[in-house]
Each structure stands twice: as C-alpha cells, then as structure tokens.
C-alpha cells in the first residue's frame, strides 16, 4: 500500500479490525520509509448484477428502482423507509446467493411480491396491480382471495 505522505510502496499493518458495517476491514498501517501512520479500508468487490428484462435487454440492478416502486405502493401506509431498505437488502442477498451475475426481472418482481406480502397487504396489492398488469377485475379478485387466505392463515398461526 502506497504511503500518502512519501509515496513509498511498503508499509506494515499495525492493527486490523472489522469496520462498523461488518463488510469492511479497517487497517492501521505504518510506512517503512517515513514511519507515517495511515488508515486503509478493504472490502469485497461485488460482481455487478445484470437484470434481464422481458424483451431480452440487460441493465444493471438498481436498488433505487425497487425502492421507488415499493415507496409508491406504500404511500400513506405504515411502511417506513427502513422497512423498505431492509426488504431490498433481503431481496439483493437472495439474488446474489442464488444467481450468478444475471437475473430475470420476473424473479426480482416475485421476490418483491413475497417481501411485500409479509410487510403490508395493501402495499402488496398496490404493487401487484402494476407489476402483474391485470387484464380484468377477475384477476384482481383472484389475487385478493389469495391474500385473504394468507392473512387468515397468519392470524390463525399467531393464536
């Protein structure tokens, strides 16, 4: 590691510990030439995720797109930004664990739906109405019946 003071490229690690975020290592170093001390941070470089859209085009995975879609669906609902961020983190971890660099947009949509079903039923229905592009009221009614069964099952299991 190059010293920021004298540009010498040899240094010794004095201290090494995990940073607060848990994904970074903080290292205190001392330059072999001028003995200046400095801090470096090391983290894993994640492979960029590509989303394969329905028309076959590819674009980089965007947490912001998911956040905006969920936020619009969650307007005036008891869903915090933190709840949304946590859901997106779980979605991204799932994708990185189960897919190698590319994932279909449909998979992402289904993961979002799964998270929203657990988070807030109304937000789920709002998101589904856009995501699934319902063709008629019957399709919406089927979704509502499905959600009603799920909610009742959850309430029964809590008793």
UniProtKB/Swiss-Prot annotation:
Keywords recorded for this protein, A-Z: ATP-binding, DNA-binding, Metal-binding, Nucleotide-binding, Repressor, Transcription, Transcription regulation, Zinc, Zinc-finger
Necessary cofactors: Zn(2+)
Domain of life of the organism encoding this protein: Bacteria
Cofactor note text: Binds 1 zinc ion.
A biological-process GO annotation: negative regulation of DNA-templated transcription
Single Gene Ontology MF annotation: ATP binding
Stretch list, region Disordered: 1-21
Main function: Negatively regulates transcription of bacterial ribonucleotide reductase nrd genes and operons by binding to NrdR-boxes.
Name under which the protein is recorded: Transcriptional repressor NrdR
Gene name linked to the record: nrdR
